[in-house]
Amino acid sequence: IWDEPVVVSARDTEEAARVPSPQKRSQPLCSCNDINDKECMYFCHQDVIWDEPVVVSVRDTEEAARVPSPQKRPQPRCSCNDMNDKECMYFCHQDVIWDEPVVVSVRDTEEAARVPSPQKRSQPRCSCNDMNDKECVYFCHLDIIWDEPVVVSVRDTEEATRVPSPQKRSQPLCSCNDINDKECMYFCHQDIIWDEPVVVSVRDTEEAARVPSPQKRSQPLCSCNDINDKECMYFCHQDIIWDEPVVVSVRDTEEAARVPSPQKRSQPLCSCNDINDKECMYFCHQDVIWDEPVVVSVQDTEEAARVPSPQKRSQPLCSCNNMSDKECLNFCNLDIIWENVDTSADPEFLG
């Protein structure tokens, strides 16, 4: 019930003042570092459910409208995808370039608090300079459509959703070929940005692990920075080689260890250089001679999925019978150091 427009958050033009808030939340939008920062407290709690509209910020008076922000930033908080989006521009630049505050938010009337956002976006509204700025990340992504929350990575099981990632990386796990593939982007960046695991994709419940992907790709989904990270290698290549999911690598959980392979071969997949290497022997012969699948390698546990291989080899672990079998080639060569490669041998593979 504001007689005059109030400067508080981002949702503002006179037009927007007639548009409802997307929905009510049972949790705040963000957590303020300083609970005495009324402007932040208002922004974070604005969609929670106010019984009566509350005036919470010094910046909301006509007087304050002429008072600059207490401190200025040398850089914008984020970058808007649409430079004509006044609400976004205000939010991202509010402590940088405004000599006089701009009226940009509408969620401040009792009426507007019940009105949803005008539309959903398929792309983020802006890109945050600091991806750890949760308020900014939320703002930029708040109108994106998630059709259904999906579990996509081994690291997002029901157990994992309560457990933070074991460690933070300074680099992504992998690089997505399509930066618009949200599932891939989440997987590759999951240990960098998120303090708490987020359910965002679908491919990873125990059920989904046995269901083939809806379509096959001719190129990997992404490129792993560490080819010894079996979980990443599986994720990036999962829609290329498998007609039906086969238990062969990191994903040989205790459950899967009891499930036979869908078909048998009359010849081994490859020949091991060291016949005492049980992991290699199992891999090469898994569809030939085992009556029941055997768990033979420490490297197939969820723990091992995060542990790099103990050492690098100068020779392949084994030799593949079929040089076009990418799974076998990757397995046999995964710990080799390629320093000076002779590409004349098989340019298609080595290239």
UniProtKB/Swiss-Prot annotation:
Where in or outside the cell?
Answer: Secreted
SMART domains from the entry?
A: END
Q: Which residues would be cut away as propeptide?
A: 6-29, 54-77, 102-125, 150-173, 198-221, 246-269, 294-317, 342-351
InterPro entries attached to this UniProt entry: Endothelin (IPR020475), Endothelin_toxin_CS (IPR019764), Endothln-like_toxin (IPR001928)
Q: Does Chloroplast show up as a keyword for this record?
A: no
Which UniProt keywords are listed?
Cardiotoxin, Disulfide bond, G-protein coupled receptor impairing toxin, Repeat, Secreted, Toxin, Vasoactive, Vasoconstrictor
Q: Please tell me in which tissues this protein is expressed.
A: Expressed by the venom gland.
Q: List the disulfide bonds.
A: 30-44, 32-40, 78-92, 80-88, 126-140, 128-136, 174-188, 176-184, 222-236, 224-232, 270-284, 272-280, 318-332, 320-328
What this protein is reported to do is described as: Vasoconstrictor activity. These toxins cause cardiac arrest probably as a result of coronary vasospasm. The major effects of sarafotoxin-m are a progressive decrease in heart rate (bradycardia) that turns into an arrhythmic phase that is followed by an A-V block.
Q: Which family does it belong to?
A: Belongs to the endothelin/sarafotoxin family.
Protein name (Swiss-Prot/TrEMBL): Long-sarafotoxin
